[in-house]
């Protein structure tokens, strides 16, 4: 038997996509079982490790999810890595591990600076950690960066100035 692939083949991607599409968020155990079985067929595959973690996370079993996210992250890249970092940071927040969550989001935002979702979830972690001013500043900058309406553009300097002020409180 040869080495087990840690790649995401088109076939494996289709299998993962189908299982994800068919999951029942109210009853995640069949999805957990499916991905755990798939992992036995592809041991150490980071993409499957991520999906197992995500399934446990959705089921409310955050401590278990973290184990899988941590195993998956070194082997992931691109959008899957971004999603794993987001879910990992969010899960740490849900477990009141705010400093760790914020470290994950700081690194993730540096690696994926164009990710709006990372910035939103970073703001949630800042808020949960009691840093409401910095959370609001993060969201204000997101609005200024991404909401290009005439009204926002007119007040962009004021929005950015307020964001800077809040971030430094």
Task: Identify the meaning behind each predicted range.
Residues 74, 127-150:
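TPR/TPR-like (Sel1-like) alpha-helical repeat modules
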Residues 18-21, 55, 91, 125:
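Residue-level signature for tetratricopeptide repeat
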Residues 47-111:
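Alpha-helical adaptor scaffolds
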Residues 25-28, 62, 98, 132:
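TPR-repeat structural position
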Residues 13, 47, 80-83, 117, ...:
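Start-of-helix register in tetratricopeptide repeats
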């Amino acid at each position: 038997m040869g080495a087990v692939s840690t790649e995401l083949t088109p076939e494996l991607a289709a299998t993962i996509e189908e299982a994800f599409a068919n999951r029942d968020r109210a009853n995640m155990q069949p999805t957990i079982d499916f991905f755990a079985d798939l992992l036995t067929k592809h041991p150490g595959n980071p993409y499957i490790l991520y999906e197992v973690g995500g399934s446990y996370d959705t089921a409310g079993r955050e401590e278990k999810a973290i184990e899988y996210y941590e195993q998956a992250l070194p082997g992931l890249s691109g959008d899957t890595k971004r999603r794993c970092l987001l879910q990992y940071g969010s899960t740490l927040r849900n477990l009141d591990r705010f400093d760790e969550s914020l470290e994950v989001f700081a690194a993730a935002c540096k690696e994926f600076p164009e990710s709006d979702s990372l910035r939103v979830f970073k703001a949630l972690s800042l808020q949960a950690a009691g840093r409401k001013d910095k959370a609001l500043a993060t969201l204000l900058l997101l609005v200024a960066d991404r909401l290009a309406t005439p009204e926002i553009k007119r007040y962009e300097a004021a929005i950015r100035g307020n964001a800077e002020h809040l971030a430094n409180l």
